[in-house]
């Protein structure tokens, strides 16, 4: 009788553990989905930051260039490189883009 009860107890424990494993797998699957969604949102946020940075950078670069053009149109002699260094801004932008790209390499 004890051996039958022991066997029933063992089977019950095994079934319970199997169910717990299945529940754990389902929970891990949900956590994985949530993590993937969070990564997607983080990637979108970083892309938005890069986009905003690009707009700011464009304003900082093209603003002085526009000023130089207006000054030239008004008859002044202007050295555009004393106002802005396009290569410096391009290099900075490329470095930032590269660092963001490296962040998401798989």
Curated annotation (Swiss-Prot):
The keyword Repeat does not apply. InterPro entries: Vesivirus_VP2. It is found in: Virion; Host cytoplasm. The keyword NADP does not apply. Keywords: Capsid decoration protein, Capsid protein, Host cytoplasm, Virion. GO terms for cellular component: host cell cytoplasm; viral capsid, decoration. Pfam families: Vesi_VP2 (PF05332). Homooligomer. The portal-like structure consists in 12 copies of VP2. Interacts with capsid protein VP1. Minor structural protein that forms a portal-like structure at a unique three-fold axis of symmetry, following binding to the host receptor. The virion attaches to feline junctional adhesion molecule A (F11R). Once attached, the virion is endocytosed. Acidification of the endosome induces conformational change of capsid protein thereby injecting virus genomic RNA into host cytoplasm. The channel formed by VP2 may allow the delivery of the viral genome through the host endosomal membrane. The N-terminus domain points away from the virion surface. Translated by a ribosomal termination-reinitiation process from the bicistronic mRNA coding for VP1 and VP2. Belongs to the vesivirus VP2 protein family. This is Minor capsid protein VP2.
């Amino acid at each position: 009788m004890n051996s039958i009860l022991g066997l029933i107890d063992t089977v019950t424990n095994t079934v319970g553990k199997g169910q717990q494993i299945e529940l754990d797998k389902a929970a891990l699957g949900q956590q994985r989905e949530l993590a993937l969604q969070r990564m997607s949102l983080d990637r979108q946020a970083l892309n938005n930051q890069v986009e905003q940075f690009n707009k700011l950078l464009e304003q900082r670069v093209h603003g002085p260039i526009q000023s130089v053009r207006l000054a030239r149109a008004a008859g002044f002699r202007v050295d555009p490189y004393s106002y802005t260094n396009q290569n410096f801004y391009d290099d900075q932008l490329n470095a930032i883009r590269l660092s963001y790209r490296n962040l998401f390499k798989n």
